[in-house]
Amino acid sequence: MALTKLGNPEAKADRSLETFPIDDTSQEIRIDCREFTCRCPITGQPDWATIRIDYRPGGRGLETKSLKLYLETFREEGIFHEHLATLIRDDLVAALAPVQLTVTVNFNARGGIALAASSTYRREA
């Protein structure tokens, strides 16, 4: 797959994730996205979160500008926090075919309650 978003000032937010070849599958890669926003599916109120992605590559690395643009597509979407962790996990697994991947969403407190949800994928041996 060609990288079309990195270095492209015209790149638009969409749900496509770009990857690149990575030879060292023993690496453990962590990505923190600290400026995520979406909306409550019931009230429409904005929610802010940090999203952490931990993965062991299965031959592909995640290009981070495409991830940034992917995450921007949720800005106006109403979604439950628990569903978000699984949706992002499934999309990343489809793009990367990793050995292991965990997505953790840590939402800021609203009404005095903070929520964190994790969703993990492990490749079958």
Swiss-Prot record:
Gene3D superfamilies: 3.30.1130.10
Localization, UniProt: Cytoplasm
Annotated protein name in UniProt: NADPH-dependent 7-cyano-7-deazaguanine reductase
Organism, scientific name: Frankia casuarinae (strain DSM 45818 / CECT 9043 / HFP020203 / CcI3)
GO CC terms of this entry: cytoplasm
Family under the similarity heading: Belongs to the GTP cyclohydrolase I family. QueF type 1 subfamily.
Residue positions of the active site: 40, 47
Top-level class of the enzyme under EC nomenclature: oxidoreductase
Stored HAMAP family: QueF_type1
Gene Ontology BP annotations: queuosine biosynthetic process; tRNA modification
Residues reported to bind substrate: 62-64, 81-82
Pathway: tRNA modification; tRNA-queuosine biosynthesis
GO molecular function: preQ1 synthase activity
